[in-house]
A protein has these predicted regions:
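Hydrophobic beta-strand positions that form the internal "hydrophobic ladder"
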Residues: 1, 48, 91, 133-134, ...
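Conserved strand-to-loop turn within each blade of WD40 beta-propeller repeats
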Residues: 4-7, 15, 50-54, 62, ...
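Short loop/turn segments that connect beta-strands within beta-propeller blades
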Residues: 15-18, 62-65, 105-108, 148-151, ...
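WD40/WD-repeat beta-propeller blade N-cap
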Residues: 28-35, 71-78, 115-121, 159-167
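Loop/turn segments within WD40 beta-propeller blades
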Residues: 38-46, 82-89, 125-131, 171-181
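Loop/turn-rich, solvent-exposed surfaces of beta-rich toroidal or solenoidal domains
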Residues: 115-154
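Blade-level signature of beta-propeller repeat domains, shared across WD40, Kelch, NHL, RCC1
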Residues: 169, 173-201
Length: 201
């Protein structure tokens, strides 16, 4: 488990079996401003990724806390990082600069794909089929994106009303009896609203 803090620090936590509380295994100053996201890599036990309000996405070597192996600049704070569920070398970042970027760890000079969603990217969530993404785009509602290595990112569907506040959270909630439909839950901030809607695959 990983945690990010408003101080700019990130921490990796362990929860040993038969113990009630988690213990911090390592902690380090990752960003000059608030750290918005931190996660250990699902593909490498020695890697972690973080993003902060200093406009940086950073890759870390967990064998040496505080050793940044790569720092990738964005145009605004980095708020979200998700690895591809089945392709070990791909991950996505979301930012206040309103773009979703796809990165390839084998060539990190620039993103391999990018898509503007018209609002700060606060949440990204893969579908079970690994070809669709939910995106909470803050002041521009919720999106369903498609991704393939060949065509990149594409906007498939948008959902806004009755949300009237910041698009904050989104998740897939299982499926309907029809195999081509998927239930989606979205929530917005100041209006305290949770909505359920369906997406057709």
């Amino acid at each position: 488990v990983a945690a990010s803090y408003s101080t700019g620090h990130c921490a990796l936590l362990e929860h040993p079996e038969h113990q009630e509380a988690s213990a911090t295994s390592s902690s380090w100053l990752a960003h000059d401003l608030e750290a918005w996201v931190c996660q250990p890599s699902r593909w490498s036990s020695q890697a972690a990724l973080s993003g902060g309000d200093d406009c940086r996405l950073k890759l870390w070597d967990r064998r040496s806390a505080g050793a940044c192996s790569r720092s990738l600049r964005h145009d605004a704070g980095v708020t979200m990082i998700v690895e591809h569920p089945t392709v070990p070398y791909l991950f996505l970042s979301g930012s206040y600069d309103e773009s979703v970027r796809v990165w390839d760890t084998r060539a990190l000079g620039r993103p391999v794909h990018s898509l503007s969603v018209g609002g700060g990217v606060w949440r990204l969530k893969w579908s079970a089929c690994c070809q669709r993404l939910l995106c909470a785009a803050m002041y521009n509602g919720f999106k369903v994106l498609a991704f393939s290595s060949a065509t990149g990112l594409q906007l498939l569907e948008e959902f806004n009303s009755p949300h009237s506040s910041i698009a904050y959270g989104a998740d897939w909630v299982g499926s309907f009896s029809e195999s081509d439909r998927q239930l989606v839950a979205t929530c917005s901030f100041y209006d305290h609203l949770l909505c359920l809607w369906s997406h057709s695959f």
